[in-house]
Amino acid sequence: MDSSNNETTHEFPPYFKVYKDGRIERYPDRFGNGGQDLVPTGLDSKTGVQTKDVVVSPESGVSARLFIPKINGPDPKFPLVVHYHGGAFCTGSPFKKIFHDFLVSLALEANVVVISVDYRLAPHHALPVAHEDSWAAMQWISAHSNGQGPEPWLNQYVDFGRVFVAGESAGANIAHYVAVQAGATGLAGPNVIGSILVHPYFGGKEPDKMIDYMYPTKDRILYPEVDPNLSKMVGKKVLVCVAEKDWLKDRGVGYCETLRKSGWNGSVGYFESEEEGHGFFLWNPSSDKVVPLMKAMVDFINQN
């Protein structure tokens, strides 16, 4: 066998590596053991949260998972959180246990409907496909605001006057992108009140070799400071959550400063988890630092 077939040009553990012949091979998924951590939909007996999967686009194959809190009384209407998962744009899924369990908790604690988009992943689908899929999903969701969309749960249970976009890490980047797109190009139907960005992943001053490989341009998608539409971002408030020991903390802090200087007329909230690292609430959900982080998000959603 020709040993050159195994020569790599790029290696980005724990995500993927690129061979000299152009092949791309993913490392074992850090969010699930070979698919064994996929969680089926149904009723969560401990929380009363129900889940189902929906097809957003048959053409692209993009789907999403819906989370509905326990229903008490007739004709309930809940705020909606449109969520985008993390994973450096190249791994993760709302169907994985690590994200599913977190979103069950969010639906329960905030008493909201959550829809989490399973966008296509880089590098097999080059950036900005993840962002384009996520914006298309937001438009599909918005088509339900008149009660006539294709998904009954969205028609029946969502108060489209109270919509939020949210995400962690790369998903926070996508949530920001969707909010800016909604403000710059318009989004008919829903009232997007705010954005929740947890441990956001934006471009920084130091080179990021993996991002440079996946998206080799200093584009507004990764660098909000060069986005001429930043001040048009939809919503009246943003919550940025960082972790003290997260290597991305400075980028979250910088995002707050950039947004405040942009001319955007909303309020910028900031929450920091002490002594914790990137995505700790996913990897260690029993940490006592998860409770105040969740409370910050719940309060942000439920406060007028």
Indicate residue ranges for each PLM-predicted region:
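Alpha/beta-hydrolase superfamily serine-hydrolase fold, recognizing
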Residues: 2-304
